[in-house]
From Swiss-Prot:
Protein name: S-layer protein B
Organism: Acidianus ambivalens (Desulfurolobus ambivalens)
Induction entry: Constitutively expressed.
Protein's UniProt keywords contain Metal-binding: no
One Pfam family from the record: HMMR_N
Coiled coil region boundaries: 358-392
Ranges that cross the membrane: 487-507
């Protein structure tokens, strides 16, 4: 093994000499370590540990190899350089794990207390020749992950890349791909053990893709991850959540192992929770999509259907029941349009509705206060009435007590009068009976008289007829008498008849 290593080193040296001579360079110094862009783990912030390997076929044997280091934020050495060794007989120097203490460095004239991650420049000098090598000092507790996102073989810019800890699902970092479809993320890393990450990428209009990445212990170079996604023609994008007039923007929060986008929202018990959703196909608003949510409440499967509100937007409303709070709902929202289907998840945290409860209690308190005020008025009115009635009762009692004897005398007097009236009534009743008997006798007598008069009237009527006959005979005999004489006779007869009738009527009335 050592033999092969020596051959490899010798070959590298000869290649370096060949390149140096062929280029006609003025220096033959070749630096093998550190190499440009090398990542160096900062295990101890108090010292910077490097591997130094150089070769210079022109420099004399035993030439001193010096190292000068500068870093970010104007970090530099306090001296012109540090000798790390001498070239051996093969014109080489190889030093492993050479430690540069922090006491050799300053920043802006002040000695630093610890190294910080960043880009450092290592300048190696041998016999008047030097080479500057850029390196990256990284924290051993961090690892850089380079995520390249492609769609149809073309880099996809604007994709959101997220890295999660597989063990606990914690979101570690999020970044967006650049124009080359690349996102650089530096995440926590435990260099003493194997680390597992879940890398996801998503962009509106594209499928969410993810990949689990395993990084072994003591790994210091960047980890490259390639993700390939496909366009989605039909997409549902929640715009905002609304509950009790409060609007909450909808922000995606992808969870490891879930291909659907996940959104987190909160609402209050006993209210109507709404999700405003954009439905697009190839970026254009869609009307006629069917969007519904399914969820479990107290073990019962429930569902709600969204209504179209215009411009490709839909309102999905859910009535949150009164239950033991707080409680959580997982809303699985699925939309279909033609042959396309899209699904996302909303995790809803339902909290107690203290506002409505306070309003309800305030309303009840107001009603009770109003009723109490009304009762106070009624009680005051009753008290006044009772006081007045008590006064009247007292006055009436005094009046009655003072007039009992008077009323007793009046009652006795009334009883005497009633007895007198009863006696008088008895007398009047007896007299009335007597009068009635007398009147009955008189009526009977008058009736007899009327009958007699009727007979007389009949007789008189007969006589009148006879008289009329006589008069007619006389009229024939006495034609020379004037009309006036005849009229007087007729009037006399009529007056006699009227007198007789009047007498009859008087008797009937008396009867």
């Amino acid at each position: 093994m050592v033999k092969y290593m020596n051959l490899i080193v010798l070959g590298m040296l000869m290649f370096g000499v060949f390149v140096t001579l062929s280029l006609g360079s003025s220096t033959a110094l070749t630096v093998y370590s550190p190499f440009p862009g090398e990542h160096v783990a900062l295990i101890n912030p108090k010292e910077l540990i490097l591997n130094i390997s150089v070769y210079d076929p022109i420099a004399p044997v035993n030439s001193t190899v010096g190292v000068t280091i500068s870093g970010p934020y104007d970090i530099k050495m306090t001296s012109a350089g540090v000798p790390v060794g001498e070239l051996n007989s093969s014109h080489m120097l190889t030093v492993t794990d050479y430690a540069f203490p922090v006491t050799l460095f300053e920043a802006n004239g002040t000695q630093i207390s610890a190294f910080i991650p960043g880009q450092y420049n290592v300048t190696i000098s041998v016999a008047g020749c030097s080479e500057t090598i850029p390196i990256y000092v990284i924290s051993p507790n961090e690892i850089e992950i380079l995520v390249c996102v492609y769609s149809n073989g073309v880099p996809l810019p604007g994709a959101t890349v997220s890295i999660y800890n597989v063990t606990n699902g914690e979101l570690l970092l999020t970044n967006t791909t650049n124009s080359q479809g690349l996102a650089e993320l530096t995440v926590p890393y435990v260099y003493t053990m194997t680390n597992e990450y879940n890398v996801t990428a998503v962009k509106p209009g594209y499928q969410l893709v993810y990949k689990e990445v395993t990084v072994p212990a003591d790994h210091i170079t960047p980890v490259t991850v390639k993700l390939t996604t496909k366009p989605i023609t039909f997409v549902l994008t929640p715009v905002y959540f609304q509950d009790m007039g409060v609007i909450e923007p909808a922000e995606p929060a992808q969870l490891p192992g879930t291909p659907e986008p996940v959104y987190v929202a909160s609402a209050y018990m006993g209210t109507t929770f709404s999700i405003i959703i954009n439905a697009t196909e190839s970026g254009m608003p869609v009307q006629g999509a069917t969007i519904s949510a399914s969820y479990l409440i107290s073990g019962k499967q429930m569902s709600s259907t969204a209504t179209y509100i215009g411009n490709g937007q839909y309102n999905l409303s859910i009535v949150l029941p009164n239950s033991t709070v707080p409680y959580d709902l997982e809303l699985v929202i699925t939309g279909t349009y033609q042959t396309n289907t899209y699904t996302f998840i909303t995790l809803l945290s339902v909290q107690p509705n203290f506002y409505c409860e306070i309003q309800r209690l305030q309303s009840e308190v107001s009603v009770l206060e109003s009723e109490v005020d009304q009762l106070k008025v009624e009680i005051q009115s009753l008290n006044e009435t009772l006081t007045l009635q008590a006064s009247e009762i007292a006055s009436l009692k005094t009046y009655l007590e003072g007039n009992v004897s008077y009323f007793s005398m009046q009652i006795s007097s009334l009883e005497s009068e009633i007895k007198y009236l009863n006696s008088t009534l008895m007398t009047l009743s007896s007299e009335l009976t007597t009068v009635n008997s007398t009147l009955t006798s008189e009526v009977n007598s008058l009736t007899s008289e009327v009958n007699s008069l009727s007979t007389q009237v009949s007789t008189l009527s007969t006589e009148v007829n006879n008289l009329n006959t006589t008069i007619n005979n006389d009229n024939q005999k006495i034609s020379s008498l004037t009309t006036l004489v005849y009229g007087g006779i007729i009037l006399g007869v009529i007056a006699l008849i009227i007198a007789i009738v009047a007498v009859v009527l008087v008797f009937r009335k008396v009867a």
